[in-house]
Amino acid sequence: LSPEALHKRNIKALFEKPEINVLIALVAICIGLSFASPYFLTAKNIVNILRQFSLIAILAVGQAMIIITGGIDLSVGSVVGFTACFGAAVARMGAPPGITLLSILGIGAVVGLTNGLFVTKIGIAPFIATLGMMSIARGLSLLITMGVPIHVDPTWISVFGGGYVGIFPVSVITMLMIVGIGFVFANNTTLGRNVYAVGNSEKSAKFSGIRVDQVRIMVFTITGVLASICGLILVGQLEGADAFYGNGYELDVIAAAVIGGVSLSGGEGNVLGILVGAALMGVLKNAFVLLAVPGYWQVVATGVVIIGAVSLDSLRRKRTAK
């Protein structure tokens, strides 16, 4: 191929990547909103957007790994609420910071591990197993709070939700660290490559000596821990916990992952695309607020975005198959 033809092919391949198209859409939406609202590009609003989508991005890293292996986790939102309530209750009892932190992360890991065991050892479909866990976690949240929000006096825990390092919120720095770790894990470790191998072909992965069940249990457990981190951040931001924290997060997280190029068929997706997808979701939610669009339209928009992203992925796969 001539240098010119090679250059054209590289440009075409670049624009065929879902995350690049989403990034272009994100930039276009931001430009449009900067004209539609004088508040969009203010420093305060930009920080609000970053804080808003940081939780979705953290959860989407875990959700993406599960989807890439061919599964799905509908319980992430409820687990966020459950770990937040559990952590707030422990903190309110006067437990030392280290004990409180370990208990929050530990309970998230246990929930994720339980999901993984249900799927691999009992053979329950991920959709059903996590749907059941969604109900269990929400019910446990109500039992802990007795339907009344738990208030936590501003302590060390508030640093996670409301603290800053320079001009950046701690929650945003936490998100960037998790995205960075996720990127290295997915691209530079054997375990990360095994996640993709399981999603591409479970049978081939088994023949290659990959312990498929262990990989699936691992990604569910990681997602549980990430949900507990989000629960901790919410307690810090709002100085307390409510049984309905995280309600609806599962759809936002799935949308962010799918928009970012994670295929619901499994075996495909990358962490940087997930970050862009989460950012797009955050900007869209912020746009609804700035433009005074009724809140229920946000739910409609999320559904439209998921269907649209899945449809585009399906069309792209059919075109590639030809």
Cite the ranges covered by each PLM segment.
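Cytosolic-side transmembrane-helix boundaries in multi-pass membrane proteins
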Residues: 1-25, 180, 207-214, 286-322
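Single transmembrane alpha-helix segments in multi-pass membrane proteins
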Residues: 31-93, 117-124, 257, 261-271, ...
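Transmembrane alpha-helical segments in multi-pass inner-membrane proteins
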Residues: 227, 237-303
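Membrane-interfacial amphipathic/re-entrant helices at transmembrane-helix boundaries
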Residues: 1-60, 94-100, 210
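Alpha-helical transmembrane segments within multi-pass membrane transporters and channels
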Residues: 94-134, 276-277
